[in-house]
Regions:
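Charge-rich, low-hydrophobicity low-complexity segments
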Residues: 1-119
Length: 119
């Protein structure tokens, strides 16, 4: 299993929509390609690289990919693992709205707590 570690650089003012943070989206991609995946805060569009420090390596498939998420502002991030079908997502902090929403497979581990509308 290969692991990609992402660490939030700063706490978002608004909710940061992170539906790209899922093993299915990271699988088979380089760190540069992962950093280029989209996210948004309010009406503003960003890339994951704008908000997260990214290290490690993704697996060839979602099933071979683990994502570790760190940072003090994870409670302001939504849609972690949304639509994931395989792999593992580990949130070392609070997981908020729509974390693993529409999840079809894989594993979620939250090391602190869920907040609103998770799962």
């Amino acid at each position: 299993m290969n692991t990609v570690t992402i660490k939030l650089k700063k706490v978002p003012d608004l909710y940061l929509e992170c539906e790209s943070v899922a093993p299915d989206k990271f699988a088979g991609k380089s760190l540069e390609e992962i950093a280029a995946l989209p996210c948004s805060e309010g009406k503003r569009n960003y890339t994951l690289g704008d908000w997260f420090e990214i290290s490690g390596a993704a697996g060839a498939t979602a099933d071979e990919t683990t994502i570790d998420v760190y940072g003090p502002g994870t409670s302001k991030c939504t849609y972690f693992g949304a639509w994931m079908t395989a792999g593992e997502l580990v949130v070392h902090g609070h997981a908020d709205m729509f974390t693993v929403a529409w999840m079809e497979g894989g594993q979620l581990n939250v090391r602190v707590a869920f907040r609103h509308f998770a799962g």
